């Protein structure tokens, strides 16, 4: 097939543009689970450690009305830890301080409430025992009082902790079926303690308030002693095991939230890895990116240049006449019906000869006119 029968040069399809660089926001996605963890369920509003929601029972605010002989009634506030299922039983009865009570003479037959006390001396001893120890210990006096209250059949346990700094370091148990009330420190707590130390007969009624289980952290801690809880003098009720290790059971909502955070972290990690791979591939293609862009510009320019078919007289079909124009690239004569490329400088060449030249040089072979711009080359 001769050059005259070749089809006209078509603009080649442009290669796809390089992929856009990854958004910088993708690099911030791994911080999303951390932000969700701080804003989600269990986050502490005061900057302290978030609540873990451990233990089977919920925490509810309570009001304790204490009646003392020949004195005004004392109103105390605190937190009750107990089972959330079903209506809560009404708590009330005589208050007995376990540190000074005589079990054989003062334990009443009807329901009564045990009072456990941790004073400044016990707290100081507690901190001294914990210094240099990697394993957490608890105030021995409080543990002994709680054990004694369980075995003597107390219907509830009232904790008087004058120094509440120990509450953050002490795991407070809901003691199975026996609710625990932790009182907030106030002047009335001091008055109640003074009355109980003087063996003044006091009674209390406990009424519940709204749920605080989402804001307060409580942990279920068991000890290593088992026995039967006594329900007055008439018999034995409930097997109580104070034993072993700390049970850590999270609420279903907290477990679901942890699963959501885990999935979000995995998705964010995958997106970051994909963005890094895409950026790596783009960096590998970067050295040739400018060259490809320049070639596409030259191809578009060639497609816009004029072409024409060579028309010779019949006499010049057989032998070229003297003075017939030639292609300055291949030095061959122009033949009839050949495709010629007409440059902006009006010079003509064989299209198949000058196009490869222009792809490399971008200038007219005769006058050095730059086909990409309206100026002449300095070469």
Curated annotation (Swiss-Prot):
Claim: Membrane is one of the keywords in the record: yes
Protein's UniProt keywords contain Membrane: yes
Stretch list, region Disordered: 1-21, 44-63
Pfam families in UniProt: zf-RING_2
Membrane-crossing residue ranges in chain numbering: 25-45, 253-273
GO cellular component: membrane
Topology term for the membrane: Multi-pass membrane protein
Cell location: Membrane
SUPFAM superfamilies the record matches: RING/U-box
Known glycosylation sites: 188
ZnF endpoints (RING-type): 327-368
PROSITE patterns: ZF_RING_2 (PS50089)
Gene Ontology molecular function: zinc ion binding
Swiss-Prot/TrEMBL keywords: Glycoprotein, Membrane, Metal-binding, Transmembrane, Transmembrane helix, Zinc, Zinc-finger
Superkingdom of the source species: Eukaryota
Cytoplasmic side: 1-24, 274-379
Segments on the Extracellular face: 46-252
Name used for this protein in its record: RING finger protein 215
Protein source organism: Mus musculus (Mouse)
């Amino acid at each position: 097939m001769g050059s005259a029968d070749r089809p006209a040069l078509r603009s080649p399809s442009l290669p796809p543009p390089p992929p856009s660089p990854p958004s910088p926001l993708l690099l911030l996605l791994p911080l999303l689970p951390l932000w969700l963890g701080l804003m989600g369920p269990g986050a502490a509003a005061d900057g302290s450690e978030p609540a873990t929601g451990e233990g089977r029972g919920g925490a509810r605010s309570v009001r304790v009305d204490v009646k003392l002989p020949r004195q005004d009634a004392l109103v105390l506030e605190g937190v009750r830890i107990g089972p959330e299922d079903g209506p809560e039983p009404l708590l009330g009865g005589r208050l007995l301080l376990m540190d000074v009570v005589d079990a054989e003479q003062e334990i009443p037959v009807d329901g009564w409430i045990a009072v456990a006390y941790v004073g400044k001396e016990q707290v100081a001893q507690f901190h001294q025992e914990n210094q240099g120890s990697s394993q957490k210990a608890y105030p021995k006096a409080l543990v002994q009082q709680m054990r004694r209250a369980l075995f003597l059949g107390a219907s509830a346990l009232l904790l008087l902790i004058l120094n509440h700094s120990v509450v953050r370091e002490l795991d407070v148990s809901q003691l199975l079926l026996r609710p625990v009330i932790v009182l907030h420190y106030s002047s009335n707590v001091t008055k109640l303690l003074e009355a109980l130390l003087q063996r003044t007969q006091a009674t209390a009624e406990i009424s519940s308030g709204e749920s605080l289980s989402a804001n307060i952290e409580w942990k279920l801690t068991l000890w290593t002693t088992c026995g039967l809880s006594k329900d007055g003098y008439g018999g034995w009720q409930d097997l109580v095991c104070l034993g072993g290790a700390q049970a850590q059971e999270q609420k279903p909502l907290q477990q679901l939230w942890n699963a959501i955070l885990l999935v979000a972290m995995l998705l964010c990690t995958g997106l970051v890895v994909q963005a890094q791979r895409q950026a790596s591939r783009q960096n590998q293609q970067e050295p040739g990116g400018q060259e490809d862009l320049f070639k596409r510009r030259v191809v578009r320019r060639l497609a816009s240049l004029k072409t024409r078919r060579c028309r010779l007289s019949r006499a010049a079909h057989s032998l070229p006449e003297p003075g017939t124009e030639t292609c300055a690239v291949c030095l061959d004569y122009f033949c009839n019906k050949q495709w010629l490329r007409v440059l902006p400088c009006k010079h003509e060449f064989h299209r198949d000869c000058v196009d490869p030249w222009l792809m490399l040089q971008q200038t007219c072979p005769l006058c050095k006119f730059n086909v990409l711009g309206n100026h002449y080359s300095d070469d």
